Amino acid sequence: MIRKVVLCLLASPIFIASLCAADSRAIADGAFDEFIRQDFASLAKRFSPEMSAALPLEKLAGVSPVLKQLGALRTGRPTPQIMAVQGMNVFIYTCDFSMTRMNIVITVNPAGQIAGLQIAPPPAEAPKPGELVVVTDSIKLPATLALPTGTGPFPIVVLVHGSGPNDRDETVGANAPFKDLAEGLAARGVATLRYVKRTKQYPQSPVATVKEEVIDDALSALALARQQPGVDPQRVFLLGHSMGAYLAPRIAQGGPAPAGIVLLAGSVRPILDLAREQLQYLGAPLSMLDTLRASAPASYWDDLAGYDPVALARKVQAPFLILQGERDYQVTMTDFNLWREGLKARQDVTLKSYPKLNHLFLEGEGKSLPAEYSTPGHIPAYVLDDIAAFVKKPAGR
């Protein structure tokens, strides 16, 4: 669920010897190659004592599913950016994987040992002049407004990402579901606003809870959408995908009620429960749960303890459209049926599932696997039709 995975970053307090940058580069390159080919036994031999204690071989090997989710490295080993930090050399390899772009950061101490290893998203680009920006206090997130052709005012849908450091298109592998939604809905007379997620734009800035990670910026985006020329401020809708759908009831409770809420692959169960189910589905070691739990502070999990999105949704005074891919292994039909059961008393809730669709709402056959996301695809017209019909339906009907 949380795609940014910090393996370890430790600085040895004792500098035994000084290594020139060229020697350090050779060590870092070797460690990079071993990491990519998952030769964890060889890689672990390069660790400093502190690193070995923090990341023993059995934990290091548990990173294998993370590397599989990134996909294959599209090119050979990239030339790293080199920085000197506290007497150590830090090598930043910006890697184009088949599923995403990530930095692999390797720190070499003066003794020639690996003192740090990190997978993190590269810094996002700064907003372009004249570009829309979602502003929350000091946070500034580049945004894109997609308007239909013709005369407005148009209804508008604000798109809220799933977990992880997402760009404005919610790019996963070869696919960009939010771009599909923006273009497809514009062709159907519906405007959209999409933006770079905070954890993508500010990858080094910690977030204590989902309020900082998701909710505050979604509320700012909804407010920005209401201010746009050509948009009907009374018809501003919220669309959440995956974690964005999970948190949609909290977002809706944080400000003026949206005209309606669309949930795509909205989970109901706790994040760690879903993660366990995903690991079991993929045959991955359950030790990865420890990595996931450690990727966020205790305050993050405490904030979500006891959160019941269905119970909160019952209190939201807005119609819901809840859509689910039946081939989705990340958020399954179990969650969809929990929505159905929990909101069955509401007359303004529409639920629909699609037999061929996966978590990204792309068509496929048989068992869905992460490799499927590397195949280019697009959200089908029938999903776009269903969303547009919901948004354009007159209020009270």
Where are these regions (language model features)?
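Conserved alpha/beta-hydrolase "acid-adjacent" motif
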Residues: 329-335
